[in-house]
């Protein structure tokens, strides 16, 4: 199947649930992740051949998106603070607002600790879910002790 045909099919499927413009953006975001294409690929290579297996999976996933399943759950990953984290329906999808919380926390740590070593720093992330906050704090504050806690059934 040609990429342009897959895009048309995806937009038609998802437009049943979302405005067409938003559906088109969702299709492009999906294809960029699933096929490794980039925005310009959709424009300059409309005859790009998508293998049958990828086309079939994409069509199924477009149906899931039309049923309001978040793209992050379909792809099994979400971006947060410049990193990619695994997600599934048992954890909340990391939000941009939470990135702001991390940025503010890191700024406060920098102003409070100054040049002191992060080894004096202890961070606890309760109800960690995907672990994106704990991992971000650990990676941005080398030497800090980070504890992430959650429960699961």
Could you say what each language-model-derived stretch is?
Residues 1-75:
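N-terminal auxiliary segments of SAM/dcSAM-dependent transferases
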């Amino acid at each position: 199947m040609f990429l342009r045909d897959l895009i048309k099919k995806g937009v038609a499927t998802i437009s049943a649930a979302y405005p067409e413009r938003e559906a088109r953006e969702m299709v492009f975001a999906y294809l960029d992740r699933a096929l490794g294409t980039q925005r310009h690929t959709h424009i300059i290579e409309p005859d790009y051949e998508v293998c049958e297996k990828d086309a079939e999976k994409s069509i199924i996933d477009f149906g899931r998106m039309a049923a309001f399943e978040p793209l992050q759950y379909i792809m099994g990953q979400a971006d947060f603070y410049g990193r990619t984290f695994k997600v599934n329906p048992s954890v909340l999808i990391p939000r941009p607002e939470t990135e702001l919380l991390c940025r503010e926390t890191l700024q406060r740590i920098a102003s409070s600790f100054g040049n002191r070593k992060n080894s004096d720093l202890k961070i606890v992330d309760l109800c960690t879910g995907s672990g994106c906050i704990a991992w971000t704090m650990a990676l941005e504050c080398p030497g800090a002790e980070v504890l992430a806690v959650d429960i699961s059934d």
